[in-house]
Amino acid sequence: MKMNFSQIFTSIHSYIHSYHNIPNEIDKIQLLMDNNTTIKANFEFKQENLYASFCLNEELPITTKLKAKFGQYFSNNAFIIKIKPQMSEDKLIYEYKIILNDISFSHQKSSPKYNIAVLKKHKNMHLLDNIIANSLTNIAFNFCGNNFHIYIDNSLLVILCETQMKADDFLEYINSIKMALDFLNTELSGEIMYIFSANLENFAVNHCKIILLAPNTRLNFNIFIAMNYPIQEALLEALNGENIKIRLNKEEFERLCTLIHSNAQFKTSIHYILESSKAALECVLIYLSVALESNAKYAKGEECLMPKDKFKKFKKQIDCFIDNAKELNENEKSIFKNKIINQIPNSLSLKRPFEQVNMTLTDEELNILKKRNAILHATAIEHSSDIMQDALKYQKEARILYLMLYEFILKTIGYKGYIININKWDEVVEFINSYNDKTSNAIFKEDFVKCLK
């Protein structure tokens, strides 16, 4: 009979969690079945990212219950492991002897080959419209003609592919899935930008105001509020409401993965959006401007101002006019001629992606598009004597551009649900400032949710 996915996931889960304190230097693990069938896996253990690729590339016969031969027995459906440390090229390598217990495999010669990736899960990951990724879950989906299963628990994300393919091809698919998940779980998705931290110890009640500190890595500011009731809890409860969460259904998630995997410009745009979350504030705008350019290249359209035959006649007339201009020397004439090209201006090409998904841009958003070249060449980065005001200005512009790109991508994959409204930010700040310490949690929570919608 076929491999039981849930049993495999349970085994991987037990194995990883049993050795969650493995040193970060480990970069390779060899897994050996007791029947001499070898399963090789390359692990990269890093401080913030856990990744592994299990390649089950051998036919595995039906197994019976196996007696423990190595190490300690962890659970009924788990691995039995013995650690043998080695040194190789200045890197610490561990060899694991493993018995896979109570798991059945196909006995036929046409036994399927499975690829499995293990990744560290985001702390507050939400996936698809009806699944919160904090419980043991097996999700099946398809993209680019391949069937995938996702297993999720409190800290791990395990992705299994049923389709037979080379390990390098499998890693390309995993990279696309991981990029899609990273995009969906940035802190600006699901209105997390509206979650504030309550610091009740350092302020008196009469200091009840909003204090903006340096921006964190996700483009939002930590906002500390001085109140004499647990406002943070009320905010968190309010923000967990279903109506203000971005949740993709399976078809939308499949389209997102497919576009990332199959379109280089779309993938580049997502890449720079994600990279912007790690950059210094002044550099965030530069990363997002590159993503904006990739969007323009992704949204194919007419590249010429006029038909080529019409432009050829027009160019001939202009060249003649330039040749007869006595005020210009030969070098200047040549420069002017080369400047006249049959190409749509950059300002129009940058707007085109948003027009194609019927996004109506505000004056602030249009102004950001006009400043794109200045931002990219750093001429828009100005510094005054007021560092905080500079930070607020860059943060606001970055947030506007980020959410423009975010909304474009969501609309491109057919998402029709809730999308963050950038104009809500100023409303939220004003809303919180209007409340005082006599406001009850229940009233605050109810009004706060209304403010967000």
Where are these regions (language model features)?
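A broad, low-specificity signal marking well-ordered, structured residues that form hydrophobic/aromatic
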Residues: 157, 208-211, 289
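Internal, Lys/Arg-enriched amphipathic helical interaction segments that engage polyanionic partners
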Residues: 171-252
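Amphipathic, oligomerization/interface secondary-structure segments
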Residues: 224-453
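Long, contiguous, compositionally biased segments that the model treats as domain-scale units
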Residues: 1-190
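Residue-identity detector for threonine
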Residues: 10, 37-38, 63-64, 137, ...
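Serine/threonine-rich low-complexity intrinsically disordered regions
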Residues: 4, 11, 46, 60-63, ...
